[in-house]
Design a protein with these regions (language model features):
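Glycine-biased, small-residue-rich flexible motifs in mid-sequence functional cores and linkers
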Residues: 2-147
């Protein structure tokens, strides 16, 4: 799946307006696919990687309902709740976006590559403040959570 990676800097056209009020947001974002439009309604659904089947089903259900009603779903592409939220959004025929703790050229965990591919094919995107090639190091994930 080849898809161009682009960079958008804070204060530049295309940088998410909703992040501008926060001083600790990244100075630049690396993007593969698309970013949600500033006028797009969004909701973040995140949770544990190790979770119950009930938790996964509820995350998927809420994401599907949100997506079916025009709300883009944002999560982290991790196993568990995050992946269920992305799957639900796709079932709801909506867009879904992932904020990564690694470079946008890396799918972590690797088992979610088919999910990431479908997200991109359906008009969503993946974004990160970490440059392409950045490995998914443990301390990257708390940093990315602020986005």
């Amino acid at each position: 799946m080849a898809m161009e990676i682009f960079t958008v800097g804070r204060g530049q056209e295309g940088y998410p307006e909703r992040l501008m009020p926060f001083a600790d947001m990244p100075s630049r974002l690396f993007v593969r696919g698309a970013l949600p439009a500033d006028e797009q309604k969004t909701a973040a659904i995140v949770g544990a990687r190790i979770c119950t089947a009930y938790g996964k089903s509820q995350a998927a259900f809420f994401a599907q309902v949100l997506a079916a009603n025009g709300v883009a779903v944002i999560s982290g592409l991790a196993c568990g709740i995050d992946a269920a939220a992305h799957e639900g959004a796709l079932r709801g025929k909506g867009k879904t976006f992932a904020v990564l703790g690694c470079g946008v050229d890396i799918c972590y965990p690797k088992q979610n590559y088919p999910l990431m591919r479908r997200m991109l094919e359906n008009g969503g995107g993946v974004l990160s403040e970490f440059p392409p090639g950045a490995e998914p190091l443990p301390w990257h994930f708390p940093i990315r959570n602020r986005v």
